[in-house]
Amino acid sequence: TSSNNVNESYSEKDPYIKNPINSNSQYYEFQGYLVYQLKDAITSVTDLDDPDKARLVFRCDIKDDVSGIVNQYLDPILGVYTPVEEVSSVISSGMKGSVDNGVEYSFNITEDKFALGATRLVNHKTYYFMALAYGYNKTEENPFPYFTDDPNYDGRNQPFIAGRRNIQVYSAIPHFIEQEYGGT
């Protein structure tokens, strides 16, 4: 198979965890899905943070009291950690899905997030989407990222990890279905 998340069983050892608190804490585990509407078919996973090219339309995650995930990235020039909210703890207005309610496998998209004016989907127009699985490792959460000499410090301050395999652009074309399934 081309996925490392078969049956949502993704687990990857975090090479940066040296002193795990327990035997499971050195692993990233599957946490949820993020689904983006893309501007066009050539938008790639590297463009997901660019609102001119990708917009988050759906999010769900496992039920486990993890609602939002923030990674800390070290700025090599300034020498400071910058927090980046990778997964929001709330559902934004107009977005579908849930926070910490369990994984959902079916949802409706009714709005074009790139539309200027009326946002309702247009029949027979092609829309593009990308689904991204992501993982989480609680041990990567260090409340004091600068105290690297602390014996409890471990990891890189990056509890969020994005899926890297089997990422594809999917197209969808809305249309009336009355004529299908024996309709008249």
What residue spans do the PLM features occupy?
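Extracellular/surface-associated beta-sandwich interaction domains
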Residues: 1-184
